[in-house]
Amino acid sequence: MNAETCVSYCESPAAAMDAYYSPVSQSREGSSPFRAFPGGDKFGTTFLSAAAKAQGFGDAKSRARYGAGQQDLATPLESGAGARGSFNKFQPQPSTPQPQPPPQPQPQQQQPQPQPPAQPHLYLQRGACKTPPDGSLKLQEGSSGHSAALQVPCYAKESSLGEPELPPDSDTVGMDSSYLSVKEAGVKGPQDRASSDLPSPLEKADSESNKGKKRRNRTTFTSYQLEELEKVFQKTHYPDVYAREQLAMRTDLTEARVQVWFQNRRAKWRKRERFGQMQQVRTHFSTAYELPLLTRAENYAQIQNPSWLGNNGAASPVPACVVPCDPVPACMSPHAHPPGSGASSVTDFLSVSGAGSHVGQTHMGSLFGAASLSPGLNGYELNGEPDRKTSSIAALRMKAKEHSAAISWAT
C-alpha cells in the first residue's frame, strides 16, 4: 500500500459514504446515478479506498448500506430508467399513497462460494466386470492424494445407462452356475421335467379332434326294416315328419335314422336314373348309325336269284352282263335290247352294274324320275321289299345246306 491508501483508511467512513450517496447529485434531472463524484475522481484513490473500507473495514451499518446500494445499482441496469427512483434512498415519501408498480424480480448475483479446504472424500466407482466375489471393499488412492475410490465388484454384464443395477444375490449366481455347468447324463432338470409332462403338438391336435367329433356306429338294418322303408319309398320319396315318425315306430328306429336312410336312398335312386339315361342315349346312337351291310356272296346270290327279276328271266339281257361267261360287248351292243325308251334301258344297266343291290336301284330310280320306272322295265316287273327279304333268307338256307353237305362228304 502507498501512503495515500493508508491516509484514506484513517478518514471517517461515514463522511465517505455520505459523499457517495449524496442526494444533491441525484436530484438533478437527466443526471446518471453513477456520477456521485466528479469525472476526474471516479477512478481516484478516494473512491476506491472508500468502497474498500466500507466493504471490508467499516462497521456493520456501513456495510449494510453499502450492500443495499450495490443492489440498487444493479437494478437500474436491468430494468431501465423507470427504476431510478428506487436507487435514491433519501427521496421524501409523498403523503398520499401512490399505486406502486408490481415488483419485478431482481436477479440474484452469483457470489463466489467459499470453498472449504480440500479434504479426502469417498465416491463409488464401478470396477471391471466379471470379478470374483471376494466380499471386501478396496480403497484406491488417487493421484492427487486427497480422493479415494471405493471399488464395488459386479457380477453381471455391463449395462447401458438407465438400466437398474441389480445387487448380486444367491439366486442369480445359482442360476448362472446351473446354466454353465455340464448336465449329467440321465439327469433331468426342472425345465426338462416340465417339457416332458406337456404333450406334443401332434398329440394335442389328435386329442382335440377326437373330443370334437364322436364317431357313430354304422346302423345295420334288418330285412323287415328295409322292406318297410322300401314300401314307403315306393309311395313317396319325401315323407313328411308324421310319416317318418310312424315308420320309426313300426321299424323300431329313431326318426333321425329314418330321415338319413331316405336321404341316402334318394341319392342312390338319382344315381341309377342318371346311369340309365346314359345307357339309353348310348344304345339309341349306336342303333341309329348301324347300316345293314351285305357280304359279297349275298349280293351275288341276290343277282343270280330268278325271282329278283321276274318270270321271263331267260330272255333278260341283265344276266348276260352279270354272268362272267358271256362276253362284255353283248351288253353294249345296240341290238341286245328290244326297241324301247332309251332312259329305261340306261336306268336298267346302271342299276344292275352298279352295286348290284336294291339300294342302287332305288337311288337311280329316284334320280331319273318316276316316269323312267315304268311298270315294265323292258317287259319285266320289279319285285317289292318282302321278296328281297325272302330271297336273302333262302340264300342263307342254301348256304347252310351246302355247308352241311360238305361236312358230311368230308367225313
From Swiss-Prot:
Organism: Homo sapiens (Human)
Identification of the protein by name: Homeobox protein aristaless-like 4
Record's keyword annotation contains Nucleus: yes
Disease: Parietal foramina 2: Autosomal dominant disease characterized by oval defects of the parietal bones caused by deficient ossification around the parietal notch, which is normally obliterated during the fifth fetal month. PFM2 is also a clinical feature of Potocki-Shaffer syndrome.
Motif (OAR): 391-404
One cellular-component annotation, GO: nucleus
Location in the cell: Nucleus
Compositional bias segments (type: Pro residues): 94-106
